[in-house]
Amino acid sequence: SGSAANINDYVVHQEDVEAVVNALWAGGAESMMIMDQRVLFNSAVICQGNVLLLQGKKYSPPFTVSAIGPTDAMIRALDDSNAV
């Protein structure tokens, strides 16, 4: 018999992406991108099903988030976030 898996452990939700973005800002990120889209402090991250909508473009997983800033502080902010 297999174990019962929670589907939410395998799906990236809008709040998951928002939590990563917020933690990176809190950690001092100076610049950030999700996929090939620049993220600003007021950028909207919207998920419809498993598709991420950013600035009118649709992206499917896996999602890539990159940031420029103080590496140690950003890692610490990600580690300290209860939402990530």
Where are these predicted regions, by residue range?
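Core subunits and conserved enzymes of cellular information-processing
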Residues: 1-84
